[in-house]
């Protein structure tokens, strides 16, 4: 049975090689367990790190797929993305075979609920001390549904270099 994984995490986080390596490792571990479909929304912060990892792993595991739920408005203008962020975004969208895009105009809460409903696993970057956030709401929904949650914030805090 093919299984699915979603990604939730804070928009602001330290992007380090340690985090990127841990994301790659966890995604590859899930692929070995039969996960083939990965779901992300928004492509900001954590989502972009995870999406890039899926795209890179497609070179080794061409059967996996990234499903993106992107907002209908232009994030480049809204958030004032720098050239690195724009390059990451364009790199992800350039994989025409491995990326499926659905445009989303609903609320973030409804999107997060949809991602949870589609998934069996959740790889997240979630600081439990930040309780009033969209990430905390999404993790609560994932816990309620019984998703296997892999929180890399905890791992990063324990093993960062």
List PLM regions with ranges.
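Acidic/glycine-enriched connector segments
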Residues: 1-161
């Amino acid at each position: 049975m093919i299984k699915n994984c979603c990604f939730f995490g804070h928009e602001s986080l330290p992007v380090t090689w340690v985090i990127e390596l841990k994301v790659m490792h966890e995604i590859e571990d899930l692929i070995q367990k039969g996960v083939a479909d990965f779901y992300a929304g928004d492509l900001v912060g954590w989502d972009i790190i995870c999406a890039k990892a899926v795209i890179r792993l497609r070179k080794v595991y061409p059967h996996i797929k990234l499903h993106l739920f992107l907002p209908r408005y232009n994030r480049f203008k809204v958030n004032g993305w720098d050239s690195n962020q724009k390059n990451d975004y364009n790199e992800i969208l350039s994989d025409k075979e491995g990326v499926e895009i659905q445009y989303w105009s609903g609320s973030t809460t409804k999107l997060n609920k949809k991602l949870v409903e589609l998934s069996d696993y959740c790889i997240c970057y979630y600081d439990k001390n930040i309780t009033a956030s969209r990430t905390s709401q999404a993790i609560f929904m994932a816990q309620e549904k019984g998703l296997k949650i892999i929180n890399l914030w905890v791992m990063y805090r324990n093993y960062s270099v």
